[in-house]
């Protein structure tokens, strides 16, 4: 599927920027250690691939999805092969004591990417998943930023959502709270964020769901739950 053709573009949106700064990017990545949290999701996998192909000094990927992590490794080995740096994956929850043990033994990292999130509005339909959403989107961000500061990371990056602008649901509100916390902490740590809209064909997206229905020869549905 040609996604560019589907959305009416001839070139990737940031293609020129990436190409123009390719030498600087390659130089920075080659001599740096990276930690990618939530690296087995759609955005996380894309970020991990971009870092890996520039041969980082170390690239460690954390995600709770063991299956997605295995597929990520298979995909990278099939397309990029092996680099000269260290590449490790860990099937861990970044809110766990096991993650803290990982940081204690594997840190420091120069760049920390926090791409983990509960991103669906439907996840706030019950109090249990809602509590998990707040834990992941807010408190795990606070925790991972604290660890990044303690290890002396050069930069901390976190993904947000367009729904954080004038939020009308708890998912957007949780990300807005996260943004406010990070903006306050940016006085003592270099931090950047990016608000993502709905990412076409990402896991759980509507377009991904359409492909699934086609593949399984199922009718389209409009669930009310």
Give, region by region, the residue ranges found by the protein language model.
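Non-catalytic terminal and boundary segments that flank Rossmann-like NAD(P)-dependent oxidoreductase
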Residues: 1-34
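Hydrophobic Val/Ile/Leu positions in short beta-strands of Rossmann-like dinucleotide-binding domains
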Residues: 34-37, 61
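Conserved glycine-rich cofactor-binding loop
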Residues: 40
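Hydrophobic/small residue at the entry helix of a nucleotide-binding pocket
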Residues: 43
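NAD(P)H-binding glycine-rich loop region in Rossmannoid oxidoreductase-like domains
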Residues: 46, 50-61, 77, 92-135, ...
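Helix N-cap at the beta1-alpha1 junction of Rossmann-like dinucleotide-binding domains, i.e.
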Residues: 63-68
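Conserved Rossmann-fold NAD(P)-dependent oxidoreductase catalytic core, especially the SDR/UDP-sugar
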Residues: 114, 118-179, 184, 192
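NAD(P)-dependent short-chain dehydrogenase/reductase
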Residues: 170-225
């Amino acid at each position: 599927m040609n996604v560019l053709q589907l959305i009416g573009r001839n070139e990737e949106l940031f293609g020129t920027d990436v190409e123009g700064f390719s030498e600087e990017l390659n130089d920075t990545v080659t001599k740096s250690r990276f930690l990618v949290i939530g690296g087995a999701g759609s955005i996380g996998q894309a970020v991990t691939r971009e870092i890996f192909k520039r041969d980082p000094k170390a690239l460690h990927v954390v995600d709770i999805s063991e299956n997605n992590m295995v597929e990520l490794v298979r995909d990278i080995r099939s397309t990029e092969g092996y680099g000269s740096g260290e590449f490790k994956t860990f099937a861990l929850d970044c809110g766990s004591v096991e993650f803290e043990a990982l940081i204690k033994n594997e840190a420091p990292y120069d760049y920390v990417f926090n791409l983990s999130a509960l991103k669906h509005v439907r996840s706030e339909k019950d109090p249990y998943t809602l509590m998990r959403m707040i834990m992941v989107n807010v408190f795990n961000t606070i925790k991972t930023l604290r660890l990044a500061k303690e290890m002396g990371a050069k930069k901390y990056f976190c993904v947000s959502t367009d729904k954080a602008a004038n939020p009308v649901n708890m998912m957007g509100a949780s990300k807005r709270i996260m943004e406010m916390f990070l903006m306050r902490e940016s006085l003592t740590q270099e931090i950047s964020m990016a608000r993502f809209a709905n990412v076409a064909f990402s896991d759980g997206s509507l377009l991904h769901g359409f492909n699934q229905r086609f593949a399984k020869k199922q009718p389209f549905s409009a669930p009310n739950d």
